[in-house]
């Protein structure tokens, strides 16, 4: 990633874009590897689960 030759404002925008992409990827990975397993752990049997818009959780009895 050589920055020489780029305009003054260009490198700033590039850096912000890269940071934004990394944050989005981290958020997606956090969602899939941390949040989804937690949602699934809440209910072990199908009859104990309530599913709403694709997110399942333990029925509140």
Swiss-Prot record:
GO terms for cellular component: membrane; viral envelope; virion membrane. It is a single-pass membrane protein. Keywords: Disulfide bond, Late protein, Membrane, Transmembrane, Transmembrane helix, Viral envelope protein, Virion. Induction: Expressed in the late phase of the viral replicative cycle. The chain crosses the membrane at residues 16-36. The keyword rRNA-binding does not apply. It is found in: Virion membrane. Not glycosylated. Homomultimer; disulfide-linked. Belongs to the asfivirus inner membrane protein p12 family. This is Inner membrane protein p12.
């Amino acid at each position: 990633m050589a920055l020489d030759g780029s305009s003054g404002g260009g490198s700033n925008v590039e850096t912000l874009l890269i940071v934004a992409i990394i944050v989005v990827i981290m958020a997606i990975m956090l969602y899939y590897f941390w949040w989804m397993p937690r949602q699934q752990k809440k209910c072990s049997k199908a009859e104990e689960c309530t599913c709403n818009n694709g997110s399942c959780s333990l029925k509140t009895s």
